[in-house]
């Protein structure tokens, strides 16, 4: 069927996208991994230096007539204390076959309002009432909490996915923050309203 054609077509794009994302991620965050490795190494001598692996898996997380969401899980281990692992999401507009970016979904100058919503939701998820409490837990200590292009859409809303080190230390793992369509409604543009209602209908 039509879905199959779409699934085959973007494979190459997905591969390129992943390689670029992983490259950027490594450039930005490699120093943190290195420092962690150093700290670990000081405590103990690591016997696993010689093992090395790398894996990329991708699968279709959502597909309807308007949007296709790929989830790409990447991991690599080069010895040392930590493997690098991350998940990236690629949302394709099936009319144009181009990636959907935040600017395609939100009106005007949305970043500040969206950032506030992310903080509020993360507080709710952790049962705290201040940003300081979140920071004490480790959030926003390795990077700023702000809207990023690594997100996916599903019937519940938009989920921003922060890989290890992007906003929190390695030990805390990845952080997912889901904002409901109701919460972001005032910021959504016409295209996003159409998209979200199609996705919600799929979920019923």
Language-model region placement:
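Compositionally biased intrinsically disordered regions enriched in Thr/Gly
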Residues: 1-204
């Amino acid at each position: 069927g039509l879905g199959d054609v779409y699934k085959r077509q973007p494979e190459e794009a997905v591969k390129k996208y992943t390689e670029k994302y992983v490259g950027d991620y490594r450039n930005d965050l490699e120093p943190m991994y290195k420092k962690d490795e150093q700290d670990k190494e000081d405590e103990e001598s690591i016997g696993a230096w010689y093992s090395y692996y790398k894996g990329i898996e991708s699968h279709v997380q959502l597909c309807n007539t308007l949007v296709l969401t790929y989830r790409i899980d990447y991991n690599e281990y080069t010895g040392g204390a930590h493997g690098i692992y991350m998940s990236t999401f690629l949302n394709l507009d099936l009319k144009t076959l181009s990636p959907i970016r935040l600017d395609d979904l939100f009106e005007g100058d949305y970043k500040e309002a969206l950032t506030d919503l992310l903080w509020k939701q993360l507080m709710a998820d952790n049962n705290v009432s201040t940003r300081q409490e979140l920071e004490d837990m480790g959030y926003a200590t390795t990077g700023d909490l702000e809207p990023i292009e690594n997100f996916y859409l599903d019937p519940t809303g938009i989920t921003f996915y922060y890989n290890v080190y992007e906003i929190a230390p390695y030990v805390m793992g990845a952080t997912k923050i889901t904002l409901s369509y109701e919460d972001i409604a005032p910021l959504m543009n016409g295209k996003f309203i159409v998209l979200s209602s199609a996705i919600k209908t799929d979920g019923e």
